[in-house]
Design a protein with these regions (language model features):
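Conserved luminal/periplasmic juxtamembrane motif of membrane-embedded glycan-processing enzymes
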Residues: 1-252
């Protein structure tokens, strides 16, 4: 997740930074994005697989997206540095801020109000889910997907508005450069951490004791362990790996 806040600064960088670095970074972003489509864009992907050394060693074509994750923050830094240039440059900053705000907030609003026209929210396994749980479950699942898109689009919109407000306050001399950097940094941190914790949070960490000794032997396990002959056990319980942890199991 790159973050709406980082992309906002990146957009400012594209508008404000005039150096030659902007163009190769932008080209790298576009090329990496196209390559990440893989078999969905075969005319480009096949050229790279056949002619670019070691490109076919990637386990997944989406790995190329790390280039995007590198280039966009660099452009974001360029955008931030342009904001802190001398006073004569401020007029361009106001114009760029307005364009970035209207463009990115407009995209968020499109996702909020026209999502059902843009997406059908149908998953690859919806047919399988329907056979297992019924069509009502699938319809509820699609509504949840739609609600998640709305919530994230609204979340991104709020972060963009906060970022724009802080930068506007700096350009209007309401706050100084140090305070601006701190507030923008906190907004970026909140944006990234909020999404990252959906994937890695406190529930993903286990104590060393639980990792080293995930199961405790009960009396039956202790009794079986006394048998030194060659055998395998058959466990018809809940499919737990406990039996395989202590004994040679039929299931491996």
């Amino acid at each position: 997740y790159l973050g709406a806040t980082v992309i906002f600064l990146c957009f400012l960088g594209l508008l404000l930074y005039k150096g030659f670095h902007k163009w190769w970074l932008l080209l790298a972003i576009i090329l990496a994005l196209l390559l990440s489509y893989g078999k969905n864009l075969p005319w480009l992907t096949n050229v790279f697989i056949d002619h670019i050394p070691f490109y076919n060693k990637f386990r997944a074509v989406s790995s190329i997206q790390v280039v995007i994750e590198l280039c966009i923050p660099i452009l974001a830094v360029f955008g931030l540095t342009q904001l802190f240039k001398p006073e004569a440059f401020k007029k361009n900053c106001f114009k760029a801020l307005k364009i970035a705000l209207l463009t990115l907030s407009g995209i968020c609003l499109i996702f909020i109000f026209f999502k059902n026209s843009l997406f059908d929210f149908v998953g690859l396994r919806d047919g399988q889910y329907a056979s297992y749980f019924g069509q009502d479950f699938v319809e509820a699942l699609r509504k949840d997907r739609s609600a998640l898109l709305t919530a994230d689009a609204l979340r991104s919109l709020l972060f963009i508005l906060f970022m724009a407000a802080v930068i506007w306050a700096y350009l209007k001399h309401k706050i100084n450069q140090n305070i601006t950097v701190v507030i923008l940094g906190l907004l970026i941190l909140l944006d990234l951490a909020g999404v990252d914790r959906r994937y890695v949070n406190n529930d993903n960490f286990r104590s060393a004791i639980k990792v080293d000794k995930p199961y405790q032997a009960n009396e039956i396990d202790k009794l079986i362990l006394r048998d030194t002959t060659v055998f395998r056990i058959y466990d018809n319980s809940d499919g737990s790996t406990k039996a395989s942890y202590f004994h040679n199991s039929i299931s491996g």
